[in-house]
Design a protein with these regions (language model features):
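Glycine-rich, aromatic-bearing surface loops/beta-hairpins
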Residues: 117-173
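Charge-rich, low-complexity N-terminal segments
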Residues: 2-71
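Generic, low-specificity signal for short hydrophobic/alpha-helical stretches with a mild N-terminal bias
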Residues: 23-26, 30, 81-83, 87, ...
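Non-membrane alpha-helical secondary structure
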Residues: 8-11, 29, 93, 147, ...
Length: 173
């Protein structure tokens, strides 16, 4: 009770206008954080795509005549993973963004079957760095807030190593 009385004496009375102003500050800061996290996800996907030296970025799905990216992001929607654009991602329970970075693998753009391999990624911010976490902590690194493509090269190599390791599991014994 004493703390509340002291606060009221020091700060006068807090009005609904004060609460609205603070709420606007919170919403603005969350929007800025979300934009930064999404930019990391976009750059990570693009850097992975570039590092794969793909003969082409897309393949044509004969069932739908739709062009499909070889490298893309998946996010959980209604309990299942669906292809999503990073701008559609929302915060997870710890104010980060979680998604799967997926690669479709085939012999040629017109060949089937195609295999999709995905690596779970979580990006959040701690102070002056972004933290990139792969496979719930199997690999973690940080990059500066002002990042460039080279900051993602090690992460992309680890993602490719995870995919190769997962593909090994498909070889019959």
């Amino acid at each position: 009770m004493r703390i509340v009385c002291n606060l009221m004496k020091e700060n006068n009375v807090i009005t609904f206008h004060d609460l609205r102003n603070k709420h606007a500050d919170v919403i603005g800061a969350q929007g800025e954080l979300r934009r930064g996290l999404i930019n990391v996800a976009i750059r990570l996907r693009a850097t992975l795509e570039n590092s794969l030296s793909l003969p082409q970025r897309q393949w044509k799905n004969p069932a739908t005549d739709e062009m499909v990216d070889y490298v893309y992001t998946l996010a959980e929607k209604n309990g299942k993973a669906e292809a999503t654009h990073p701008h559609e991602m929302n915060f997870d329970e710890r104010m980060g963004v979680s998604f799967l970075l997926a690669v479709t693998i085939d012999k040629a753009p017109t060949s089937f079957p195609k295999t999709t391999m995905a690596v779970p990624v979580r990006v959040d911010r701690h102070g002056e760095v972004y933290i990139i976490n792969l496979r719930k902590g199997e690999y973690e690194t940080s990059i500066p807030l002002e990042f460039c493509d080279s900051d993602f090269s090690d992460v992309c190599e680890v993602i490719k190593q995870f995919i190769l390791k997962d593909l090994d599991g498909y070889i019959p014994s």
